[in-house]
Amino acid sequence: TPEYFTLSFIGDCTLAPHQNTQDYFNKVGDDYAYPFANTVQYFADDEYTFANLECTFSDRSLSPVGYPTFYFRAPTSYVNILLEGGVDFVTTANNHLNDFGDKGAEDTYATLDNAGLPYGKVGQAQVVTTKNGIKIGVYCGFNINDGYFVPTTDECVNAINQMKADGAEYIVMAFHWGKELYYKPTQKMIDLAQACIDAGADLIYGTHPHVLGP
């Protein structure tokens, strides 16, 4: 294990096109390197880069499920944006994975599998290996606006113990949580994070609020 190494963490990546950004798409075309052109140098030089994939990948004409205010679907070719950008792992544990129901989620997983891009699902404990052979445990969970958290605290602690047993040298807990536009963590977030750290997690990777937090 190196004396020190760098992990990079990207926030919510919504790759789906929007009418207000159509001019950019018309100009950029299929230049998948464009979105991360100014940051790829950092991600290429680090040990491992994580991102939250806040959209579905599908080429099917699917209808939104439920009544989301926003729903995001990107063509499957847009997975190349992540690959060209130096992303090594994405979490899909968020409130937009199921914007287009089970079929949208299935297409998303298939797209990531075909691209060879590792990903995490809700409640999935796994150990990934970085380019220099470091074993990092990753566990993903989420809630919406500080509501019911999936998985539970006990399940998070059990997952940490399992990842240790599976050889993880460092453990990252990737949580899509909290309230949008709130700068400070809620007490629920603090309590869960502390329980995870006490159990042996090394880092809490939080996404969702759309603002920087402590």
Predicted regions: what they are:
Residues 1-214:
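Acidic, metal/ion-coordinating pockets
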